[in-house]
Regions:
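Amphipathic, oligomerization/interface secondary-structure segments
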Residues: 32-159
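Charged alpha-helical initiation segments
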Residues: 1-32
Length: 159
């Protein structure tokens, strides 16, 4: 269901290409290639869909409550006008915190900087894209990226 929904959303050449290549690698159980394609797509979609106060923010600021401040304010306004309290609870108590936490883990090095030489025990874009990962990427990690893409499209894609 998630993949079909993403195929319907991704109609531009670059989004189709990255999703197609990512899914081909996924079917071939090449999870490292899958993660590379899907993380590039995730970065692209977040930057296109989210109203960041400043597109040139560091990842640490961008993928925080401060970075999502404009988007959250607009969602709060729209949900108040159109949907009600349950939708606000789902968005602000569940979806936003989970999405921001996942994006932080994927895009921000935190304690696991290259110079420390300790690889994170989870998928991190910098370690992967800079050729520093020394472990296999698991299938479930690629499914997590697909889930994040689906959540982003659900939350921000129809604006």
């Amino acid at each position: 269901v998630i993949i079909e929904g993403l195929k319907e959303k991704y109609v531009s050449d670059e989004t189709q290409l990255y999703l197609k290549n990512g899914m081909q690698a996924f079917e071939n159980e090449d999870y490292m290639a899958t993660a590379m394609y899907l993380l590039a797509l995730l970065d692209n979609r977040v930057n296109k869909l989210v109203d960041f106060p400043n597109q040139r923010m560091s990842y640490r600021v961008k993928y925080s409550n401060d970075g999502f401040a404009n988007q959250k304010a607009e969602d709060f306004r729209q949900l108040t006008e159109k949907r009600g309290i349950m939708s606000k609870k789902i968005y602000f108590l569940e979806m936003y915190p989970s999405l921001i936490a996942y994006l932080n883990r994927i895009f921000i090095d935190g304690l696991y900087k290259f110079e420390n030489g300790i690889e994170p025990p989870y998928l991190n874009r910098n370690w992967l894209m800079h050729g520093r990962m020394n472990r296999n990427i698991e299938r479930y990690e690629c499914i997590q990226i697909l889930n994040a893409l689906s959540v982003i499209e659900f939350m921000f894609g129809d604006r």
